[in-house]
Amino acid sequence: MVKTRFAPSPTGYLHIGGARTALFSWAFARKQGGKFILRIEDTDLERSTQQSVQAILDGMAWLGLDYDEGPYYQMQRLSRYQEVAELLLKQGLAYRCYASKEELDALREQQRLAGLKPRYDGRWRDSKQTPPAGVTPVVRFKTPREGYAVFDDLVKGRIAVANHELDDLVLMRSDGTPTYNFGVVLDDLDMGVTHVIRGDDHVNNTPRQINILKALGAIIPQYAHVPMILGADGERLSKRHGAVSVMHYRDQGYLPEALINYLARLGWSHGDEEIFSQEQLVEWFDLAAINRSPAKFNPEKLTWLNQHYLKIAEDARLMELVTPILLGRKYSLPGEENMFKIINLLKERVSTIEELADASAYFFQAVEPAEALRTQYFTVEIRPVLEYLIDRLAQIEWKREAIHQEIKQTVSSHKLKFPNLAMPLRVMVTGEAQTPAIDAVLELIGKEETLHRLRDQLDAFPQ
């Protein structure tokens, strides 16, 4: 059975790159009818936090990336790492190294000055000397000195690294915790991981991990190293490109299906398809279709996709998402029926839930027009026309059709073009120059509030 895993370190939030790796691993497992494992690599005691663990779990849940096993935690498996390290020591495949940090720093400096690649020199590999007193050793792996570590990467193709290029990596730190390369190997082995899908910043780790797996007599999983994500400027994606946490996008009003769709297209494609569901992604997903070149992160494309998903979203769902924002702004909200109408009017005009909240503000409170709009639309000539319209609006039943007829009649009787009246009317009531159909807007704002705003704004007109 195919088994994939996502194994983040809880030292921050679930970011865009990590989310894409998780998505590809999840999609491949689902496509193959396999299992997807979540593993938390929390052995960096100084940087790992429970807050980060929760942020990862929240991000996965929001994106709908459900896992079949886990979350497993490395710190709960310490005895296993220690057990296997002891086994390798007994088999002569690992050794204790007592070199101090100062010694190793001095060695690296000598190598640097000599123009050599910094690497451990194996000074304790076959040493017979007495260990120094009071020094807790690390455990190092005896990397083979001959031959090659070879693997057929499912994205990059065949990769071969000469073993003499690799130094004897540390397996266990002096504090009894495993290093990344040792922990990940044992975890993948014990959990039966068949396919390791991860960022290509791990390519250099793979030959080391393969050598450890061979020493343990294990079956080597298949590897797929996904190219990194770049900013529009070609530099590695960072916060300055907008590469914030997944939950930041949620809080900014993006829908999870938009982010999933966008992440899937970052370095993977299915023909010319731009928009597809999570179910279609699973149906179409193929590691061979992952591009070998880095993908460029484009916030505008993500926003475009989000706009699409907002347009087709159920009004009830959008109301559920926008209501907490509106209540947080202390707005008094109308009943469900009118809220649905407001959302339906606006959802094709906005790109995020946050924008939906912003765009709906004038339905819940009077918004003062900008001075430039007053200057443009509040004219001496239009004032008597508006006074006439206000008197007529005060007498009608407050329905959209009736409002429309009164505006139309006023335009006709004063020999105006529709925008000549609709624009100042719109600005007076909403404070905006662009809104949905003005009759629909006025109906939802309500008769009393509309008339109040119109009369209030008349005072701002030149006499």
Curated annotation (Swiss-Prot):
Pfam families: Anticodon_2, tRNA-synt_1c. ATP binds at K239. GO terms for biological process: glutamyl-tRNA aminoacylation. It is found in: Cytoplasm. Its EC number is 6.1.1.17. A motif ('KMSKS' region) lies at residues 236-240. PROSITE patterns: AA_TRNA_LIGASE_I. Gene3D superfamilies: 1.10.10.350, HUPs. GO terms for molecular function: ATP binding; glutamate-tRNA ligase activity; tRNA binding; zinc ion binding. GO terms for cellular component: cytosol. The keyword Amino-acid biosynthesis does not apply. PANTHER family: GLUTAMATE--TRNA LIGASE, GLUTAMATE--TRNA LIGASE, MITOCHONDRIAL-RELATED. This is Glutamate--tRNA ligase. The lineage of its organism: Bacteria, Pseudomonadati, Pseudomonadota, Betaproteobacteria, Nitrosomonadales. The gene is gltX.
